[in-house]
């Protein structure tokens, strides 16, 4: 009994223990699940909070980027609008000036027409005078024949002797009368031609008044201080050597304060080198790799500037469509100097003068401007290609299919060949006007002295000349003749002889005035 009791008691205890364990396990499981679920929810909440922060941060960044983009777009738009406004104002100013000049041109055209009518009437008077002179010559011949018969009868001369006397008297008398008539008509023709030529040129030049500025073979770059010179030279001169090798320009660094001189015969290379050096000085970082980067940037900038200059020249001359490559070649003329004259400005001046002259005589004004603008196009490449600038210009114009009148003007503007069109003649005249006007071009002192000496030599070699003087910078030669060798009416023949010899022996773009002076002095000594 007692054993059963303990057994039963043990079984119950074990059952209770098992039950307690099971209950504890269940309770532990639920507690574990509860706390684990709470931790998961906390982690999820933390993750959601972080996600919201990230989204908020991204939104803020996006808003900031949008604000910056809007600011940049607004700034760029303002710059573009300002640039457009400036260009529009420039175009409006040019059109306004052009309209005013056209008004003045129309008024002057009416005046010119009246002068032409007056010139026609003068021409009729000259023709009438010529007929009268021919009639007088016939009458003189009749009188001479009568005198011949009388001389043969009275002087008992042979016919040959009388003929010689009469021929000499007739020749002298006719020469005197013809020289007097030539002098009178020449003065009248010169007066009328001078008035008409001045009117034409004034009308043409009033439409265009361009400045020609001589340029040198050096450029000067200003630097902020003397220490910058050392940085430009670099360690053992590596920076300055790199600059000179890459740009092809000589850098001259001397004792001149805060300046560096760039020397080169090629103005385009010199301009690129100048911009490169200015960029390096402003940037402050000067070393070989930086020099290469600055050179690349400056080259692109100068190329763009050349294109802009070509486009501007084509625009202001209103010549129509031009091949893009020809535009670039035209822009290079801005950096080309001939006799200290900027070739692009010279070409613009020739274009406007040729155009106005063409309009005066009823020719194609636009075609004349186009031919004038391109007449020196070969000078842009004459240092890159073989041949004269005329030959190169003809090749370029033919390559880009310019009209035959333009090609003819290029080929004949230096009289290398005879002009085949009126346009070519007008371009040659405009070229002479532009290059020969005072101050347009400069020549060396040596050439200047040689030309003056040659003028005086030609004059002194003429028969009957006592002495001569070249004055007005070689634009006039004054000749004094011996009065006992040259008669009054023969000084015109002397002037013409000297003029023809000058035209034959001297090459000069312009007009040289020949003035012949004959002076007779009578001296008597009174004894007291």
Curated annotation (Swiss-Prot):
S-S pairs: none
Gene3D superfamilies per UniProt: Hypothetical protein af1432 (1.10.3210.10), K Homology domain, type 1 (3.30.1370.10)
Location in or out of the cell: Cell membrane
UniProt EC number: 3.1.-.-
Transmembrane portions of the chain: 15-35
Keyword Iron: no
InterPro entries the record matches: HD/PDEase_dom, HD_domain, HDIG_dom, KH_dom, KH_dom_type_1, KH_dom_type_1_sf, Ribonuclease_Y, RNase_Y_N
Keyword Ion transport: no
BP term (GO), one: mRNA catabolic process
Source taxon at top rank: Bacteria
Molecular function (Gene Ontology), one example: RNA endonuclease activity
One Gene Ontology cellular component annotation held by this UniProt entry: plasma membrane
Membrane topology: Single-pass membrane protein
Domain HD span(s) in chain numbering: 343-436
Domain KH: 217-277
A Pfam family that the UniProt record links to this protein: RNase_Y_N
Keywords from the named record: Cell membrane, Endonuclease, Hydrolase, Membrane, Nuclease, RNA-binding, Transmembrane, Transmembrane helix
Family statement: Belongs to the RNase Y family.
Function: Endoribonuclease that initiates mRNA decay.
Protein name: Ribonuclease Y
Organism: Onion yellows phytoplasma (strain OY-M)
């Amino acid at each position: 009994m007692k054993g059963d009791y303990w057994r039963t008691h043990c079984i119950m205890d074990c059952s209770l223990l098992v039950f307690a364990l099971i209950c504890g396990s269940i309770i532990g499981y639920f507690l574990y699940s509860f706390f684990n679920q709470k931790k998961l929810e906390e982690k999820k909440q933390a993750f959601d909070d972080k996600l919201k922060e990230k989204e908020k941060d991204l939104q803020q960044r996006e808003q900031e980027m949008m604000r910056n983009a809007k600011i940049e777009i607004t700034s760029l738009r303002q710059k573009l609008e300002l640039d457009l406004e400036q260009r529009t104002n420039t175009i409006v100013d040019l059109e306004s000036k052009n309209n005013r000049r056209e008004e003045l041109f129309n008024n002057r055209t009416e005046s010119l027409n009246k002068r032409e009518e007056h010139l026609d009437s003068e021409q009729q008077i000259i023709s009438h005078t010529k007929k009268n002179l021919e009639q007088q010559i016939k009458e003189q011949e009749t009188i001479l024949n009568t005198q011949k018969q009388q001389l043969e009868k009275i002087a008992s001369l042979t016919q040959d002797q009388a003929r010689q006397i009469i021929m000499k008297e007739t020749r002298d008398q006719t020469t005197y009368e013809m020289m007097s008539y030539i002098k009178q008509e020449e003065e009248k023709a010169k007066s009328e031609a001078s008035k008409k030529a001045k009117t034409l040129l004034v009308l043409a030049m009033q439409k265009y008044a361009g400045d020609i500025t001589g340029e040198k073979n050096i450029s000067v770059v200003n630097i902020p201080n003397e220490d910058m010179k050392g940085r430009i030279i670099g360690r053992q001169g590596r920076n300055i050597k790199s600059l000179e090798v890459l740009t092809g320009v000589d850098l001259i660094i001397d004792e001149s304060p805060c300046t560096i001189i760039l020397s080169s015969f090629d103005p385009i290379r010199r301009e690129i080198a100048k911009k490169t050096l200015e960029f390096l000085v402003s940037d402050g970082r000067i070393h070989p790799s930086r020099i290469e980067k600055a050179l690349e940037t400056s080259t692109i900038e100068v190329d763009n500037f050349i294109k802009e200059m070509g486009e501007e020249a084509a625009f202001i001359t209103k010549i129509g469509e031009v091949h893009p490559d020809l535009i670039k070649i035209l822009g290079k003329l801005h950096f080309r100097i001939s006799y200290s004259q900027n070739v692009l400005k010279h070409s613009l001046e020739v274009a406007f003068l040729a155009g106005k002259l063409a309009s005066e005589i009823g020719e194609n004004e636009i075609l004349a401007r186009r031919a004038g603008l391109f007449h020196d196009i070969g000078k842009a490449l004459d240092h890159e290609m073989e041949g004269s600038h005329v030959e190169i210009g003809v090749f370029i114009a033919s390559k880009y299919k310019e009209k035959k009148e333009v090609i003819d003007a290029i080929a004949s503007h230096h009289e290398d060949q005879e002009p085949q069109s009126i346009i070519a003649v007008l371009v040659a005249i405009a070229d002479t006007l532009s290059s020969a006007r005072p101050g347009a071009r400069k020549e060396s002192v040596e050439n200047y002295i040689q030309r003056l000496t040659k003028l005086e030599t030609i004059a002194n070699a003429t028969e009957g000349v006592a002495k001569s003087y070249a004055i007005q910078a070689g634009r006039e030669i004054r000749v004094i003749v011996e009065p006992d060798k040259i008669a009054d009416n023969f000084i015109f023949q002397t002037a013409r002889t000297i003029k023809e010899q000058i035209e034959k022996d001297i090459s000069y773009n312009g007009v040289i005035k020949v003035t012949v002076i004959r002076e007779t002095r009578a001296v008597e000594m009174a004894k007291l």
